[in-house]
């Protein structure tokens, strides 16, 4: 039987495979013959006639090299050894059966199982897993069915679709029902995720609030430490000045020492004839302005973390309309004045009144705070300077008030009067008395102070010597400008001043440059070296109430309800905008311009995007309850905004 099967083989070779095959590799003669035929056909194809391809010689050489390499015994052993390893053996796991069984039957400890949270959801874990799977397969099958249905239409002739079998409809219904249930599971999962996100956001807001409170406490503690350190430094300086044996030059202030050398040299002969040197040295020297630098290790940053328009603090500062406010830096020291004839010093960090500045005989109309120096201009026609670093608090026993004032303090209804029942003594420096009418505007920088008065004059003061060095007549300058002629670039407005407005509404100086806004709507730029008007800016149709300039622009506010931005390089209007009511106060920083425009909110203008928005208590006021009072004065520094209202309230905002 085996012999007959061997004879029937077309190749004449035996097809009977020994257990180990040829060469012990499991290969049969049929496999070798098939391999030889494939090699022959491939070689014949590659090494065809040389006329068909120019690369035939290269193919012939390559195949000869391959044939020579395959005839080597080492190469044959390597090729035949690969047949002993099946693909299953190559990818088979190296783990033993014992290891696999051990891992399969491993269980979790009871401690971990006890920590599994209880789920109140009505959906199982498997349903949630199925809900997260995409339904692409359903969409593909649905498209295939619809495409097949469309192919049944031939030549554009619509035929009635054959009715589906009930079993198919039931399958479709079950499939749609299952997908609808999965949609419910997915909606529940989305709702849970949204709820978790809301909880995380609420927790973050609470954490941010806690950190802000901590930052506020740190800044308050920092302010107290700096205040105590400043007091100790001042006491040490006072002790050194009062200690006997120190040089006589110590009794003379350092700020006025160099400035008075020329004066002493000129009047030395008169001093010798007037009195002896020993008697002259025993005379008490008047107080001089001593600018002590405030020790500030770091600037407050709390207001930078509030959103714009957020209220920081509100204080009932006065009992009447606020006429002037100013502060040195955010959360620092504020000085406010009102029609109640008081000037109060406040700690913006704690909102506490530190005391009164007493000395004026009438209400203060204007003031400025620069470091520890305060300048106040009053309706009594005087300008007084104060040094807050010398302040010493004493009870206010000489107050002039109503007979029932003490009863109000005992009741505690007026909180700020209890906290502010002290006077700041020893901080008065000197008074500048030369005007004959109320002082309506002032500004000082360095050792120069400019004051404007209702007597229609501007006066330049030397703060070192405490005397007036120059008087500028505004009416004379206006008359001189009107007689120059019609060929001048800047013409006088020709309008009469408003009787209800201040003749000098605002002033600002920088070195030898002075800007002054008056009741005739003119903005005059003076040169203090010559005492002449360098340029006049015409554009406003009402009295100027406020102005401020920097290196490039000058911003002015007027009772004509407009704010104008001037280009100092060209002398022309750069930008302008108006509000519904007259502008009473204005100030700007690097980002925004704020203004008080006769409303219960502060008008804010963003320089970058030219956006207008409101800030103040009037935004959140209830229509039923009483509305906040009108804002009269505004001050802005480094995004920290102060507003003074008509009812005596002063509030701090982020801007």
UniProtKB/Swiss-Prot annotation:
Keywords: Coiled coil, Membrane, Mitochondrion, Mitochondrion outer membrane, Repeat, WD repeat. The keyword Ligase does not apply. WD repeats lie at residues 317-358, 359-396, 434-473, 479-536, 539-578, 580-615, 626-655. Residues 199-244 form a coiled coil. CDD domains: Mdv1_N, WD40. One of its GO terms (cellular component) is transferase complex. Residues 1-22, 134-170, 240-263 are annotated as: Disordered. It is found in: Mitochondrion outer membrane. Its main location: mitochondrion. SUPFAM superfamilies: WD40 repeat-like (SSF50978). The keyword Membrane applies. Belongs to the WD repeat MDV1/CAF4 family. This is Mitochondrial division protein 1.
């Amino acid at each position: 039987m085996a012999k007959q099967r061997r004879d029937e083989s077309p190749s004449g070779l035996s097809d009977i495979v020994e257990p180990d095959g040829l060469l012990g590799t499991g290969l049969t003669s049929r496999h070798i013959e098939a391999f030889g035929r494939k090699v022959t056909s491939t070689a014949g194809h590659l090494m065809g006639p040389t006329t068909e391809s120019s690369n035939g010689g290269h193919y012939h050489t390559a195949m000869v090299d391959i044939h020579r390499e395959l005839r080597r015994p080492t190469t044959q052993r390597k090729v035949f050894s690969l047949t002993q390893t099946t693909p299953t053996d190559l990818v088979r796991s190296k783990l033993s059966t014992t290891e696999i069984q051990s891992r399969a039957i491993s269980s979790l400890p009871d401690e971990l199982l006890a920590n599994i949270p209880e789920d109140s959801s009505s959906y199982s874990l498997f349903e949630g897993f199925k809900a997260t799977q995409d339904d692409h397969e359903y969409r593909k099958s649905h498209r295939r069915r619809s495409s097949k249905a469309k192919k049944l239409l031939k030549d554009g002739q619509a035929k009635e679709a054959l009715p589906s079998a009930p079993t198919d409809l039931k399958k479709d219904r079950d499939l749609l029902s299952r997908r609808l249930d999965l949609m419910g599971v997915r909606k529940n999962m989305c709702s849970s995720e949204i709820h978790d996100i809301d909880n995380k956001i609420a927790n973050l807001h609470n954490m941010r609030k806690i950190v802000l409170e901590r930052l506020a406490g740190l800044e308050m503690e920092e302010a107290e430490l700096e205040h105590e350190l400043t007091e100790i430094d001042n006491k040490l300086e006072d002790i050194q000045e009062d200690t006997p044996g120190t040089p006589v030059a110590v009794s003379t202030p350092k700020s006025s020492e160099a400035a008075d050398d020329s004066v002493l040299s000129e009047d030395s002969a008169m001093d010798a004839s007037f009195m002896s040197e020993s008697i002259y040295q025993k005379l008490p020297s008047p107080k001089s302005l001593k600018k002590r630098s405030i020790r500030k290790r770091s600037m407050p940053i709390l207001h930078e973390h509030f959103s714009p328009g957020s209220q920081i603090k509100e204080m009932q500062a006065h009992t009447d309309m606020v006429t002037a406010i100013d502060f040195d830096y955010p959360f620092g020291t504020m000085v406010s004045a009102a029609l109640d004839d008081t000037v109060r010093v406040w700690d913006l960090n704690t909102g506490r009144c530190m005391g009164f500045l007493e000395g004026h005989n009438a209400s203060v109309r204007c003031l400025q705070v620069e470091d520890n120096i305060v300048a106040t201009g009053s309706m009594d026609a005087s300008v007084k300077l104060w040094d807050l670093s010398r302040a010493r608090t004493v009870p206010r026993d000489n107050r002039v008030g109503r007979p029932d004032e003490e009863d109000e303090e005992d009741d505690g209804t007026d909180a700020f009067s209890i906290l502010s029942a002290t006077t700041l003594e020893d901080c008065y420096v000197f008074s500048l008395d030369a005007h004959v009418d109320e002082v309506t505007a002032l500004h000082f920088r360095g050792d120069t102070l400019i004051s404007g008065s209702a007597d229609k004059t501007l006066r330049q003061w030397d703060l070192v010597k405490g005397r007036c060095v120059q008087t500028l007549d505004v009416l004379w300058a206006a008359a001189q400008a009107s007689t120059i002629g019609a060929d001048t670039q800047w013409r006088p407005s020709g309008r009469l001043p408003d009787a209800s407005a201040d003749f000098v509404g605002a002033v600002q100086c920088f070195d030898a440059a002075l800007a002054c806004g008056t009741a005739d709507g003119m903005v005059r730029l003076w040169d203090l070296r010559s005492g002449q008007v360098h340029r006049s800016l015409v554009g406003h149709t009402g009295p100027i109430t406020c102005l401020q300039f920097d290196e490039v622009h000058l911003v002015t506010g007027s009772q004509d309800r407009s704010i104008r931005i001037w280009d100092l390089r060209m002398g022309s209007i750069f930008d302008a905008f108006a509000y519904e009511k007259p502008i009473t106060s204005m100030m700007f920083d690097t980002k925004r311009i704020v203004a008080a425009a006769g409303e219960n909110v502060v008008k804010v203008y963003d320089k970058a995007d030219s956006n207008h928005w409101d800030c103040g208590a009037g935004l959140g006021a209830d229509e039923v309850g009483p509305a906040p009072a009108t804002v009269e004065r505004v001050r802005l520094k480094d995004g920290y905004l102060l507003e003074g209202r008509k009812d005596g309230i002063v509030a701090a905002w982020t801007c």
